[in-house]
């Protein structure tokens, strides 16, 4: 069968990517929700409980979309590649016929039980409800680990020296196939990615509800909801570069040809685009922090040790020097970098010289822009190719900026600036007073931008991981002999990734409005002046 307009491979790509996005949300949102519910119980703050319940309502609606797109994915895959699909399902029959359906049914039961016992198990029974949420998350994690087995198998099927791949797979157990080289790092990367993804989507929902709120009370709540969601998302985002590097390291260790194919050959411009998007993501996070600080009364009185801006300025060049001399996993790199990064927090109290919080944030922004520039610096000025003419390469002395030590240094600096801003923001809200509901209106567009960007990055890097198989369905085992067995251009891929992202965001937006609109006050209440609320 040949799908019109898109072709078979792109048709499979569209439904698979949509399914993965919905699945990522319903697997990541429960982690986000239980953390929020636990914080509400611990702090006795009903806002956290309301946040958790509202996101659960949206998750339940999107649960059906996950099932629909999953079923559609199987049908399209069978129609487009019947022989491969049948053979692949037989390889993982126990997963697809027993484990995955059983876990999915268990997740469905627990999801609905979690929602409909919310108002029943409260007060003294709240701990019971949180325990149910933890159980739901355990099942979600099991689903993630189970389904990542076949997914990672397609990139890194197990192998052994002296044995042909076909003979080894024929004798391999189900566990051998699941526990392949990229299975665990892929699972780790998806766990923290799903937590961040759930937080960004929750922030987008908060932005919609803030913009549609009719009363100051509702605006104050959804302002707070966006604030809480984005910082939970940041927690997941800070881990993603490192789990992503671990995944790339394991895949390159499995077959070194993956590395140049990603970084210097057919997919090099995909990685350039990834650098741009992740740089924009971190800039957006820190811009939201800046807008949040501006609405805190007393923020101008918050000071930070002079060591903070000094370390921000010297960290990038210092890290590049250390990484060049002591590359991973040499522990000497930590011996140099940890004292430097911790010095503002450990030694700052002994140094009387301080600077304002806003000065630190501004310097951090400049350092982030420089780090982004280093991250994006290519080895040369052509899209692909490892053997470029000298006039197309970076000038001698500047070529270091395209090396992996420089790239890792830029990532580390981006994460460090975000951590410093987070610490500074927490210090500000403890010493000042937040006027909830009075944040700059532009912050709502930042939240929507962050959700869109994180979704787009997921689509891009999913495409990269899949395209690493080159002209195989299962790398080195099952060849793809179809006419579509080629690496698409970045423009073609980006077009479909954007279309998929827009479709996903639109469906989530409708689900959020359907689930949460009744909770907004129907009658317009008279607005008074905003009441300052001390941050907790």
Set out the residue ranges of the language-model regions.
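Long, contiguous internal "core" modules enriched in hydrophobic/ aromatic residues
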Residues: 121-165, 177-275
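Hard-cation-handling environments
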Residues: 271-374
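Membrane-interface helix-loop-helix modules in multi-pass inner-membrane proteins
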Residues: 62-133, 150, 243-259, 263-271, ...
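Hydrophobic cores of alpha-helical transmembrane segments in multi-pass inner/ER membrane proteins
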Residues: 23-34, 101-113, 193-206, 272-290, ...
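N-terminal signal-anchor module of multipass membrane proteins
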Residues: 1-54, 58-67
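Short aromatic-rich membrane-water interface segments that cap or initiate transmembrane helices
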Residues: 9-20, 87-102, 169-193, 259-275, ...
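Membrane-interfacial loop-to-helix junctions in multi-pass inner-membrane proteins
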Residues: 44-61, 87-94, 98, 118-138, ...
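Hydrophobic alpha-helical membrane-insertion segments
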Residues: 59-70, 134-155, 231-244, 309-320, ...
């Amino acid at each position: 069968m040949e799908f019109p307009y898109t072709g078979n491979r792109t048709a499979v790509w569209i439904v698979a990517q949509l399914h993965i996005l919905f699945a990522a949300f319903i697997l990541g949102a429960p982690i986000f929700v239980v953390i929020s519910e636990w914080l509400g119980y611990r702090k006795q703050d009903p806002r956290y409980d309301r946040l958790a319940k509202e996101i659960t309502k949206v998750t339940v609606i999107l649960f059906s979309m996950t099932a629909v797109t999953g079923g559609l994915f199987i049908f399209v895959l069978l129609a487009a590649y019947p022989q491969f699909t049948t053979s692949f399902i037989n390889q993982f029959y126990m997963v697809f016929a027993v484990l995955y359906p059983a876990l999915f049914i268990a997740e469905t039961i627990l999801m609905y039980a979690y929602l409909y016992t919310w108002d029943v198990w409260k007060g003294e029974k709240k701990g019971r409800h949180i325990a149910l949420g933890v159980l739901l998350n355990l099942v979600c994690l099991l689903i993630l680990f189970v389904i990542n087995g076949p997914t990672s198998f397609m990139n890194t099927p197990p192998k052994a020296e002296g044995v042909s791949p076909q003979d080894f797979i024929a004798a391999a157990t189900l566990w051998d196939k699941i526990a392949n080289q990229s299975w665990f790092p892929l699972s780790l990367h998806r766990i923290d990615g799903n937590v961040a993804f759930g937080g960004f989507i929750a922030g987008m929902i908060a932005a919609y509800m803030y913009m549609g709120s009719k009363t100051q009370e509702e605006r104050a709540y959804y302002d707070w909801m966006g604030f809480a969601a984005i910082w939970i998302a940041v927690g997941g985002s800070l881990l993603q570069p490192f789990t992503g590097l671990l995944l790339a390291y394991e895949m390159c260790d499995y077959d070194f040809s993956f590395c140049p194919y990603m970084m210097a050959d057919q997919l090099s411009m995909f990685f350039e685009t990834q650098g741009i998007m992740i740089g924009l993501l971190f800039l957006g996070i820190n811009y939201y922090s800046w807008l949040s600080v501006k609405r805190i009364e007393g923020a101008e009185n918050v000071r930070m040790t002079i060591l903070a801006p000094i370390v921000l300025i010297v960290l990038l060049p210092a890290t590049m020097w250390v990484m060049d001399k002591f590359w991973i996993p040499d522990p000497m790199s930590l011996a140099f970098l940890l004292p430097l990064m911790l010095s503002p927090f450990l030694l700052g109290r002994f140094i009387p010289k301080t600077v304002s919080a806003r000065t630190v944030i501004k310097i951090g922004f400049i350092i982030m822009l420089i780090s982004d520039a280093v991250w994006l610096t290519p080895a040369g000025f052509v899209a692909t190719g490892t053997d470029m003419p000298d006039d197309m390469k970076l000038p001698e002395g500047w070529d270091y900026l395209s090396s992996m030590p420089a790239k890792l240094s830029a990532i580390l600096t981006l994460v460090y600036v975000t951590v410093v801003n987070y610490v500074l923001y927490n210090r500000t809200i403890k010493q000042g007073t937040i006027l909830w509901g009075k944040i700059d209106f532009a912050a709502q567009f930042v939240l929507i931008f962050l959700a869109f960007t994180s979704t787009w990055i997921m689509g891009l890097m999913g495409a990269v991981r899949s395209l690493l198989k080159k002209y195989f369905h299962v790398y080195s085992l099952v060849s793809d002999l179809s006419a579509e067995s080629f690496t698409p251009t970045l423009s073609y891929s980006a077009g479909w990734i954007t279309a998929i992202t827009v479709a996903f965001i639109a469906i989530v937006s409708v689900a959020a409005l359907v689930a949460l609109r009744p909770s907004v006050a129907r009658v317009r209440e008279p607005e008074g002046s905003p009441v300052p609320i001390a941050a907790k």
